[in-house]
Amino acid sequence: VDEICRSLSAILPQVDYIRVGSELSCDARFRKHLLENVLAECNNRREVNIRMADCRIYVGTVASIASKPELFKLKHFDVAIVDEATQILEPQLLGILCARFKDGRNGIGKFILIGDHKQLPAVVLQSNEQSEVHDEGLRRIGLYNLKDSLFERLYRFHLQEEHCRAVDMLCRQGRMHPGVASFPNREFYAGKLEALGLPHQLENVDAPVRFIPSERDTESVSGKTNRNEARIVAQLAADVYHLYKETFEVNRTLGVITPYRSQIALIRKEIQALGISALNEISVDTVERYQGSERDVI
């Protein structure tokens, strides 16, 4: 949500928006847009209604919006854009899908679900067998497994409809170098991904993807840490830092992704041992939490 707020704040002339959520989960730069802070300037209910009616963009997590059903009594929304929709299970969306405005209309006129079912699914602890749906009525509407998102269920319906125009694919991407995109493009997207042709995508890089083997950590009890890998990551971070020199930017140049939080701590410890202060500030995080972020080198 912070990423969306950052993008909205960068638009000129400035776009008015209200963020639904708590200060604890909101970047300090965007706290002035929080619903509570915006309405604190209102002196009476009439001013609250006017302020909320005048603001055309509301931003928040699914949980934050769903936890404020009173919002839909005061405001009718023409469109809701649900980002990362393939990571959201149907029950999590139900409150918003069923929201009603005070006159009985749907609280939201239209939904646009944006996501990629080829990437990270929703985090579910049950196995496929435990979450499988056996009820024939539910299976007839395409609900075969409770681990599936509404996005994926509707997408399957789209594949069955010959002339359905409810689904489209964004084929042009500006993040990955073609060499990085090659494997997922071939294996998951039927070769449909195209590079925008931005400067970083046109660079003549010998090997935009490198695989560096590492030895197993025999001292790791949980199997969720590997000191050998952490040392390799730290050394690579130092190499990138020295390569970029004065152009190295903490929030843009380098990021590290690893599956487990315990490995994050180990990697940070190895990086700190290098004695390069700038590297202590780089983002080291899990796959789930890195969604939506971007760096020159991962």
Predicted regions and their residues:
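A substrate-engagement module of RecA-like helicase motors
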Residues: 2-57, 68
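Conserved helicase motor core of SF1/SF2 NTP-dependent helicases
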Residues: 1-15, 23, 49, 63-65, ...
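Short beta-strand and adjacent tight-turn residues that come in two discontinuous sequence segments
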Residues: 60
